[in-house]
Structures are given as structure tokens and as C-alpha cells.
């Protein structure tokens, strides 16, 4: 018998079970008027550029190219390194005793004569007939000049070892550019960290902040303890790798949850810093984020930071200024008054200490407005902690889209740096970090789309197009921080079908289905492939079911015979196991999977209307949150109390979550399960009203003034309604909202004129799924289903699946006589009711999707 389809427990066929904007057929419902905020997904800015065969990242500030003149380096370059600093950094070029020179110089005076900007990391690179000359403002600048040369040599324009003459005058816009390993979840392996550090150096990122939330020696209760020998050795290796790549290794500590504001813990903290100093660490950060209790006191935080600055940083002489992540790191909950912690920082914190800031919310864009707000309070340019591409709040997503949402008018006087918080998938985070490096170096010139196109070729040049196919459909978070996805793909509903649109979409689904195999065969970065593989496997399945959905749509539009249509339709339904696998590793969430789901729903709705002779009820999630308009709302209807829809952003009075029934129906029972559980969860409306409406404009209460209720149940005389919702009333709660179940008129097994016998006897909880008028639910039968035949019933249709052996159908009289017996091996079976039949009996090992009486 095949894997069971997912079981549900409401009385509606979910033809439109997915959350989304209302269809054009319902223009009278003003959904936007019911929403608490405008929800948009900003498009990716920029355009793809022709770089003439020269690809340099980050984009240089100034670059002149003379492609008519070439320097032949095929026989090697003669290294001139008077400072003796770069012998290990020129492994990308052949060296020779004679020939064109590669001269590497640095120093403020030399740089000034060459017109190099007097900032750390600035350099001038010249390629002419005499050879290559790099002049850095400092050693770091000269190293960056080498990284530009490395990319120039690797560019298509330099094929055959003949480099075009160029002049590059370059410098970084932001002083601090890098990564904060600050996510929750599985920390990176040592090998991944080492790989990433090389990546940082190659693309001119100069900061790596080591602060894994799940490193026990970084946070409480073990922050006071030294690292064990093996872990300490790895820290030293990371420090050495950073030094080779001219990256500042910043070791962060997270002591706030259990710190005691006394001399003993101050000494514990200094002692830990001393041990890290012995391992080579010369930069330190203290995180006071995500804590409660005494550790949140900003006065004590400032006193600690100032004392450490004086007694440790300045006393050492070779330690960089401290970095702090405040408790109020987001405007969402920061106290804006002069008594707030940020204002206290501004008045009392040593000016050398850099202060992290995540923006208006935890995951948000970098804008002049958010910087003006925070800078005016902390009295210094903020250090932007960008929570992208981190997915610790959405681990089912692999973010591979463009880097955007970073304002291109900002200067170092507004923001002192940017630190990207990546995914726990370090190799797969490189695509986003490629963009962060580009932005932070040359802010005004940053072109998000072009950078992404270049980054794809950098990471997987041997299978760039296949990687692009996956990446463009694996970009949205489905949460509060939405990202554009599938922007080149046009999908459509069943009633919008055109042959050209279907052909274009078919071609895309074919690329989707084929891309994983191409990547598996060609990608040489096996570590990256290993991180992507679970998503790629699901991506191939998504492509296959999208293609089958297109085939089904064509057959449905052509008026396919019912008996021929159903087996194909049933075969393309996702099983419970398939859905769980997809939910764990989602892609195509903005367009591709919704297309599949809507196509199946639209066909199923139209087909069931034909089967029933009337319009069935539908269930579709709606609400005031952006995530209420994605497939996530299906979690409210999946009959699984361990899954839930989540708003993904904070709630406020007036917000709501509800159900669209697709038309006006009698509603006599509503059951809502709030929260991720029904015990002590905080993600729920603690003050709410349950309402219904016919038109979406005028609402009437079913249950008013609900106070701290996880389980919301209403039964009563049926009311006419199309919409039912749970709306937040006045409340100080700012948590997310989670809904595990939103049931309308649920069927109850004990009220059905049907029973199970054989192995299934005694467990009739799934019995309603054979009668709920939904094609995405099913009754797994291993025995006999017996049901009473209503007077006047002339015909039955059985919709089945997973037939490994014939199913027996018997019609019995009131006294138990078998009037007719049939056997079928077909999943679609329609038969007439014999005269005098009182009971129908179905026996076999089969999935019953629906028993339809006419």
C-alpha cells in the first residue's frame, strides 16, 4: 500500500487551502482594508552589466582599462617585495627570475605620491609594459591590490596569460566589513571557518567576529572557563588564518545572562580575555543581546566596558577598541527616551567602543532613517549587524538570492561598518557574503543584481546556470523580512491558462527538475554541494510535480474522462512524508510551490464540484501579516498539532488571522488552537475576539473578550459566513502569533453513520476523512468500512489510492443479505445503488480519499 496522504479534520475540501490574495472573482472583499500594514516584497534593484571579460569583486572605486595593450605574464613575473611580507600571497601567479616585474610596496608616503587615499586598505594597481606595480597605503592595502590582480588574471579578458593594461585606484568606503558568526544552531565546523577566512581575504572583508551562540565557552554558564586544549588550538589556528588574510579576528563573549556585577566576575572576564590574548586574539567584543535580569543594566554595562577599555585595551597597547552588542539592539523594543540604554551609551560610553545595531527590527534593511535614529542616541556611527542571510528563525530555507536592502547613499560618518550574520551553512553563505563585500567596499556603485550574477559564477563556475536556476527560486524567507524570488517566472491559475504561458512555465520546471543532477555531476566544491543537497533533492521533486501539474491542467481543460483523470491527479498529490520532507527543505516558496498547490486546488475544486453537483466549501488562510499570504497558512489546516502557522513578525492590536471559506456557508462550529503549544507559549493573542463576516467589511462577534485562551471553541446555531477570524484586542504583547489549527464545522466520527471493522476497529479518528469533500485528505483502510445508505441515493463514487490488491464492494439489504458484490483494482470506481440497499461495505487495503453519494 502506498504512503498515506496527509490526514485532515475539517469538513471542507481545500481547493483553495493556500494563503494568498483573494482571487479576481471576489472584487467585493476589501482585504487590504482589514490589514494592519502594507505588505510588499521589494524587487531586486540593479541590472546585469557587461564587464568586458573583467570581473573584479568588490567593485573598484576607479579602474581604467586599455584592452589594446597587453602584458604577457605567461612565462612568469619577477617578484619585488622589499618588505618581505607577501611571499605567501602570490601563489596564484607563476614567478620567474627574469621578466616583467611584480613590485609590491606600501607606506603612507609612497601611497601619497601615487594618489592613494589615506585610509587602511587603500591601494593603487598598475599593469603596463614594465610589469605590475602595487602600492598600498598600508600592508593591508597592498594585500588587497594582490587580490584584485588575482581576479584580473583569472578573468576571461586575460586568457592565455595576456593581461590588459589597467590602472586601479581603490579604497574601502566602510572601515569594518565582515561577518559575525552570531546565529543560533549548529556552529560552523573548523574546516568551514578556515575556508571562509580565505574567502574573506580574497574579497577584502576585514573582520570576522567569532560569537557562536552555541559555543559553551562563549556564553553562560561556561564563559568564565578556559577553552579545552583542542578548542584552544583551533582558536589559535583561526587567528593565524585571519592574520594571513589580513582579517581582524574578534573574539566575542556573551556573559550577560548570569554575570554578577562584582569584582570577582570582572576578574573572571579579564582572565578570560587574557587567555584569549595568549592565543593571539587582539580584538574583543561583548554581547549583551537576548538576555534578561541584572545583566541588562546599561549603567553597569557601560561601567564594565569603560573599565575594560582603560585597564585592558589601552594597557595592552596592541588591542583594538571594543565592540558591544547592546541589549536594546533594535528599534523595535529600544527605549527611545534619554533614560534609555542607548542614550546612556551615548552620554557615558567611551567614544572608542563601537556599538552594534540591527535596525528598526531584528531583520531589517540598512537605511539612513534607522541610522539617524540610533546614531543620535549613541553619539557615534553605528556598527550594523545585518541579520542576513541568517536562517536560524527559518531553518527550512536556504537563502541564495541577491544581497539588497542596503542603502547606497550611506557614508562612514553614518555607519562605521557592516557585519553580516550568515546561515549555519557556511559554504552556502558565501554567495551573500560576496555581495556584502561588494557593498561595504564601494557603497555608491553597489549593483545588487549584477553582483549576484557574478557571484554565481564565482562559487560554481562549472555549473553556473544550474546553480542560478536553484538560487533564483531559493531566495524568500516567507517571514517578516521578505526577499524577492522567481522574478523571471510567470505563473498562472487554471482559468488564466494560455499556451505560450504554459510552454514558458514548462521550460522553467524542466530546468528546475534537471538542475540538481547537473550540480551533482559538475560542482567541484563538494562541501558546498553537501550543504545544498537536501534542498536540491526537494528542488528536483518540485520540478517533477510542477511538470505533472501542467500535464493535468491540460487534460482537465480538455475535458478528461473522470476515470482517467483521477489516477493521474492522485499520483501528483503530495504524501504526508513528501510534504514533511518539503517543509524541512523548502524552495520555490513564492511562485513554484504555490503554482503547484493552486493548480491542484483549482482542478480539484472544479472536479469535486462536478462530482458533488454543487460548490464545495474551501479553506484558505488570510490575515493581517505578510506570512498570511503564503503557503504557511496551510499549517492551520493540516490536522497536525505539532505544526503551526506563524506570523513571523510582532503582533499588535488589530492584527488578525482567519479563514476564507470561498463562499457563504452555514457555520455552526469553530475550533482554533493558538500558540505553538497550549501550556506556556507566548506566541498567541492573549486578548482577542472571534468574529465572522459575509462580505469582509461588517464583522460580528462569535466570542468576545477572550482572555489568555489557547483553545478557542465556539458552537451554536449556524450563522451565514464566508470569513471567520481571530482578532487581537488591546494588549501589550509584542510576540509573534502561532496558530496550530483553525477548523470550521469539523466532522465528528461519532456523528457519522459509518464504522470500521477488522484491524481498524476501535480507531475511528480518521473516519471523517472519507466524507469531508476534500481530495487532500484520506482514510487509510486495512479492513472494512461500513456505512448506511441514505434513502434516495442512486450512485456512489469511490476515489481511492494505493491499491495493491482488488477492493471488494458489497451492497447489503436491511437484513444483511448481499444484494450485489463488486471487485475493482481501479482507483476510480463508480456504481449504481441496487434496489433495497441499506448498507454499503468496502473491504480492502486501500486509501479512501472520498466516498461521494449522488
Where do the protein language model's features map onto the residues?
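Bacterial N-terminal signal peptides
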Residues: 10-19
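Acidic, contiguous N-terminal accessory segments
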Residues: 24-129, 135-137, 158-168
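C-terminal functional modules
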Residues: 31-35, 56, 448-618
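Feature activates predominantly on carbohydrate-active enzymes
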Residues: 67, 82, 86-88, 111-272, ...
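Catalytic-core regions of glycoside hydrolase
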Residues: 138, 154, 182-183, 278-282, ...
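Disordered, acidic Ser/Thr/Pro-rich linker "stalks" and the adjacent N-terminal cap
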Residues: 604, 609-667, 673-688, 696, ...
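Short beta-strand-plus-loop segments that form exposed binding edges in beta-rich domains
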Residues: 726-734, 841-847
